[in-house]
Amino acid sequence: MNKNENAEQPTIVKYVEGNYGGIQLMSLSRYALGYVVRGSKQIYYGDTHYTVSRGDVFYMGVGNHYVENLPDEGRPFEQIVVYYSPELLQRILLQLNMSYGMNITNTHHCERCRRLNHVAVAASPTLRSFFMHTASYLQDDNFMHDETAESIKMTELIYLIVSHEDDCLKSKVLSNVDSSHDNFEQIIHSNIFHDVSIEDLAAMCNRSLTSFKKEFKRHYFVPPHR
């Protein structure tokens, strides 16, 4: 991962590994969503390992991961990975709710979600199509340096995940919403998926309606909508 990347922007990367590199330590400072195009990936927890197969979408949390990328019968291992910060995820979820009226919820909880720092599921047709189209975009050098295009693709990816039925992948992604923001953002995020008026939100934040609207736009770059 590029250590100098802007943590406020997603980074979309295509990896092609022609040579087998064995088990490697991967240290993540941001969350990762990826898709295995060819080959398979092993993720290790001590003596236990989990397989991410071709056509699977995977999530990897912040921290250290021991991974092994396996080529496919002499053909290079290939994957597409999107890195994102919790702050960016929170802004995207807020945009989906405020601009498109999405009521984003999750009721899925399981032992594997709680215990493991990754999850892998078979990609739905829409997610598979998303990653394959993204692969074609990555062939254009201009896309790789276009932060707006990356943000649009990131929003699309999060939409496809959170609009899907509740599962491990959706649960893991939604668990990444940052809880360390100041009180203003905590109040907003705690209530954006409920039927709360702008006036009520302003009162909860101890702001006048005018001050609330100004501060909301400063935090989220869009005005609040009723």
Where are these regions (language model features)?
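N-terminal regulatory/effector-sensing and dimerization cores
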Residues: 6-106
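Short, Lys/Arg-enriched N-terminal segment that forms or immediately precedes the first helix
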Residues: 17, 165-172
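Aromatic- and histidine-enriched alpha-helix N-cap/loop-to-helix transition segments
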Residues: 28-31, 152, 179
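Amphipathic alpha-helical segments enriched in hydrophobic/aromatic residues interleaved with Lys/Arg
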Residues: 96-156, 160, 186
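Conserved phosphate/pyrophosphate-binding and hydrolysis machinery centered on Walker-type P-loop NTPases
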Residues: 147-151, 174, 205
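Basic/polar phosphate-binding segments, predominantly the helix-turn-helix DNA-binding elements
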Residues: 160-167, 187-191, 195-226
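Short, basic, alpha-helical segments at the C-terminal edge of helix-turn-helix-like DNA-binding modules
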Residues: 176-177, 226
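Short, leucine-enriched amphipathic alpha-helices that occur as contiguous helical runs
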Residues: 177-185
